[in-house]
């Protein structure tokens, strides 16, 4: 049996607490990672796997569903802590909750505002899938408490506030009784156990939450896992020894690195981790070489495995007459006027192209910034008429004068809020352009998974020049690179075939065969 221990953590200091955000504020980082890719591989081969979840994830079922791994069996540390036994999901409606008779409900496009006696009483916030995610309660316009809902239909935890600052968080069982209380003020942070449930814990007080998490995870592993099991541990950015020390003596461990998560890792701190693991996987060739150079004694156990996202379909853009270009802009970098102009100029010169400018998880002002820049460049250097796709009559107008015509243009700006929205956008895309100093990782993974050629300024493991993409020496070469893939089918088909061959090397059967071979070699070396 393979057990996967993911790193689905929060972005703050309390990494064990998964970020709880409303649907209109999407995460500023990828959800897709190495663990998700690996589990899908095992599912494709109908091999049994189990997830061991360390993080507090009250919306875990929706997360697993979004990533197409909902059927995966799992053990959750916080389900153990909170005595949650059922995995049946239940969608709560606003009417299912108890409210005072004088509550007034105001429905907005984003959330439900609740008022009592003319005063703000609560904000009801929703997740991406439309379920009640959390409710903020206010007193005298100050945040008083935050109820976080489990996607199985109960209040999972309550965060209490004083003067707008977090004081403590109670983690509840499905009956609403608090099981543990986490004190959140920096100078007094610790965890206490409700004495009523003392028999379920080794101690009544813990110095920090990770101590309790490791206690529960260690107990589960020691009582439920066979000694010769295989553990795939997603490498944490800082240390992995706490988890690795819990693994049975005769089990086999695989340590998996993912660039998006581990780019801040201090190489020097990884020595003990690499010595312990039987096999080490990385998603980037350059990081593999770095580890091998830094730890030559462990070099033979370090291997490169490229992730793909099997939710994408190959080659669907051939069904479109127009060539759709997806141009990724990274708002963490300064807008490159010249790059945007060159892309717009190419589209203006080629009437059979359409342009989608994709911005990842942008706030409204970020979208506006891109819109203003596009309008400015077209106004100063191009002709808006060159971008007209079609015009049609405005049904509200009384006469067919030109000024009453609605115009549709061959470019639009799209805010990419998550991986699924990018997948939908790439479904019929012909060419990806990303001229950032650090190309978006998931866009590159999605591009090769869908067989779409990509134009970049920077070389990477995912794009090979003139095979499945074009690496520019300078932005001035953009038109040459775009023509290479859009003028005729030969080069585009070659990129598709290259992607197919690369994906074939990473099908479930091939990957698992390699894993077993690498593991055997590593174990034999011991």
Curated annotation (Swiss-Prot):
Q: Which InterPro entries match?
A: Accessory_SS_Asp1
Q: Which UniProt keywords apply?
A: Coiled coil, Protein transport, Translocation, Transport
Q: Which domain of life, per UniProt?
A: Bacteria
Keyword check for Transport: yes
Q: What is the role of the protein in this entry?
A: Part of the accessory SecA2/SecY2 system specifically required to export GspB, a serine-rich repeat cell wall protein encoded upstream in the same operon.
By sequence similarity, the record places it as follows:
Belongs to the accessory Sec system protein Asp1 family.
Q: What is the protein name for this chain? A: Accessory Sec system protein Asp1
């Amino acid at each position: 049996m393979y057990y996967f221990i993911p790193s689905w953590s929060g972005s703050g200091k309390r990494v064990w607490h998964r970020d709880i955000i409303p649907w209109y504020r999407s995460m500023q980082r990828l959800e897709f990672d190495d663990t998700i890719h690996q589990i899908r591989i095992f599912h494709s081969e109908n091999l049994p796997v189990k997830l061991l979840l360390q993080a507090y994830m009250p919306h875990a079922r929706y997360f697993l569903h979004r990533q197409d791994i909902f059927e995966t069996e799992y053990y959750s540390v916080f389900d153990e802590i909170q005595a949650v036994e059922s995995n049946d999901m239940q969608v709560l409606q606003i009417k299912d909750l108890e409210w005072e008779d004088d509550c007034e409900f105001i429905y907005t496009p984003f959330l439900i505002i609740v008022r009592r006696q003319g005063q703000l009483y609560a904000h009801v916030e929703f997740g991406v899938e439309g379920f009640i995610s959390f409710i903020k309660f206010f007193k005298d316009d100050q945040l008083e408490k935050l109820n976080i809902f489990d996607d199985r239909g109960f209040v999972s935890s309550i965060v209490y506030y004083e003067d707008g600052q977090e004081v403590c968080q109670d983690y509840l069982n499905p009956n609403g009784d608090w099981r543990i209380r986490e004190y959140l003020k920096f100078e007094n942070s610790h965890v206490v156990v409700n004495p009523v449930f003392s028999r379920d814990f080794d101690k009544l007080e813990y110095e920090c939450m990770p101590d309790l998490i490791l206690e529960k995870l260690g107990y589960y592993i020691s009582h439920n896992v066979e000694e010769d099991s295989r553990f795939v541990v997603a490498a944490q950015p800082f240390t992995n020894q706490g988890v690795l020390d819990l693994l049975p003596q005769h089990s086999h461990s695989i340590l998996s690195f993912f660039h998006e998560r581990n780019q801040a890792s201090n190489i020097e701190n990884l020595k003990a981790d690499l010595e312990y693991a039987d096999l080490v996987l990385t998603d980037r060739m350059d990081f593999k070489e770095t580890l091998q150079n830094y730890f030559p004694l462990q070099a033979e156990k370090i291997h490169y495995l490229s992730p793909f996202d099997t939710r994408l379909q190959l080659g669907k853009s051939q069904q479109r007459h127009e060539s759709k270009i997806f141009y990724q802009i990274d708002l963490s970098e300064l807008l490159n006027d010249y790059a945007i102009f060159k892309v717009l100029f190419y589209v203006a010169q080629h009437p059979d192209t359409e342009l989608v400018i994709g911005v990842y998880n942008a706030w409204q002002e970020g979208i506006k910034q891109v819109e203003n820049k596009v309008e400015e460049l077209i106004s100063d250097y191009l002709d808006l008429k060159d971008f007209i796709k079609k015009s049609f009559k405005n049904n509200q107008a009384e006469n067919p004068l030109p000024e009453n015509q609605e115009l549709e243009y061959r470019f639009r700006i799209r805010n990419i809020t998550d991986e699924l929205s990018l997948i939908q956008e790439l479904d019929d895309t012909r060419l990806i352009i990303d001229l950032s100093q650090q190309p978006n990782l998931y866009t590159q993974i999605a591009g090769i998974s869908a067989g779409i050629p990509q134009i970049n300024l920077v070389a990477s493991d995912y794009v090979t020049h003139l095979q499945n993409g074009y690496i520019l020496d300078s932005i001035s070469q953009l038109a040459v690179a775009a023509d290479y893939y859009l003028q005729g089918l030969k080069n585009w088909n070659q990129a598709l075939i290259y992607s197919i061959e690369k994906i074939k090397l990473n099908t479930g059967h091939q990957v698992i065969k390699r894993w077993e071979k690498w593991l055997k070699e590593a174990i034999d070396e011991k």
